[in-house]
A protein has these predicted regions:
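Short, conserved "active-site rim" segments that organize catalytic pockets and cofactor/ligand binding
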Residues: 2-22
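Glycine-rich phosphate- or other oxyanion-binding loops that anchor nucleotides, phosphorylated ligands
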Residues: 2-5, 29-250
Length: 250
C-alpha cells in the first residue's frame, strides 16, 4: 500500500505504545504537532500527536495532509463514558459523531462510513476486550462531572465523549478521505474527575512542577490522580492492541 494510514491522538499517553512499536523512519514537526513517519504491523503509518481540542486536532491533520494524502485517517485516544455499560478500557467505534457547543446544544452531526464494512465485526473477534459501536460526542472542554456525563449521554443517546473527533471527521469528509474513530474509555459515566486545568496546557502537556504543586496542596486528590493514571494505562493498552489487530487485517 503506497498511501499511509494517519493515526491521530491528542496526548502523548494515548500514542506512546504505538510509537514504541513502530519502526520510525522520520520524526518531524507539523506546526505544533509531533509527527512520526514509519511502519507498524507492516503498514505505512504517520503517527501524529496533535494536542488537545478541536483546533489542535484540525491543525495537526492539515499539517500532515500538506505532505501526503492517506489511505485512511484513524482518530484515536481516550474518551469519557456516557453509558453505564461502558467500563474503563472498553472501546467505542463511532458510527456517528456529534459536535456539541459550549451550551451543550446540538451543533453538527457526521455519519461515519468506513471503507471496511466488516471493521466492527473483525475487531469484536477480540473477545477479551469489550467493543461497542455507537455515537461519539465531541465537546471543547473536559467533562469532569459525573452528572454532566449522565445528562450528555441521555440527551444525545451517545456512548462516549471526546474533544477532537468532530473536527477531524469534518475535514476528512470535505477532502473525501476515509475515516474511522476508535476511542478507549478512560473514565466511566459514574466517575467525576479532578480539574486538571491548572497543570495541563492547551496541547495536553502535563507540567510536572504544577502537577506536583497541585498534589501537595490537594492531598485528597492524590488517590484520584493515581487511579486515573492506572485507568489511562489500561485504556492505552487495549486501544493499542485492537489497532494492531486492525492493521494486521487491513
Amino acid at each position: 500500500m503506497d498511501q499511509p494510514i494517519f493515526i491521530l491522538g491528542a496526548l502523548r499517553e494515548e500514542i506512546n505504545l504505538i510509537r514504541k512499536l513502530m519502526n520510525v523512519k522520520e520524526q518531524l514537526k507539523a506546526g505544533h504537532a509531533d509527527v512520526w513517519v514509519g511502519s507498524w504491523e507492516r503498514v505505512s503509518i504517520v503517527l501524529v500527536r496533535t494536542g488537545m481540542g478541536k483546533d489542535c486536532a484540525l491543525s495537526g491533520l492539515k499539517g500532515v495532509l500538506s505532505r501526503t494524502v492517506p489511505a485512511l485517517v484513524l482518530s484515536i485516544g481516550y474518551a469519557g463514558g456516557l453509558d453505564l455499560r461502558l467500563k474503563v478500557g472498553d472501546l467505542v467505534v463511532a458510527d456517528k459523531v456529534l459536535e456539541i457547543d459550549q451550551a451543550a446544544t446540538f451543533s453538527k452531526s457526521y455519519l461515519v462510513n468506513p471503507q471496511q464494512p466488516d471493521l466492527f465485526e473483525r475487531l469484536t473477534s477480540q473477545k477479551k476486550i469489550m467493543i461497542y459501536k455507537g455515537t461519539l460526542l465531541t465537546v471543547n472542554q473536559v467533562i469532569s462531572d459525573s452528572s454532566a456525563k449522565q445528562e450528555l449521554g441521555s440527551s444525545h443517546k451517545a456512548l462516549a465523549v471526546d474533544m477532537e473527533t468532530s473536527s477531524i471527521i469534518g475535514h476528512c469528509i470535505e477532502k473525501k478521505i476515509p475515516f474511522v474513530s476508535v476511542r478507549a474509555i478512560s473514565d466511566t459515566m459514574e466517575q467525576s474527575l479532578i480539574n486538571t486545568s491548572s497543570f495541563v496546557d492547551g496541547e495536553g502537556k502535563v507540567s510536572k512542577i504544577k502537577a506536583g504543586w497541585y498534589a501537595a496542596t490537594h492531598p485528597s486528590a492524590i488517590k484520584n490522580l493515581i487511579s486515573l493514571r492506572s485507568q489511562s494505562q489500561k485504556a492505552t493498552a487495549n486501544l493499542t492492541e485492537i489497532l494492531g489487530v486492525f492493521l494486521r487485517t487491513f
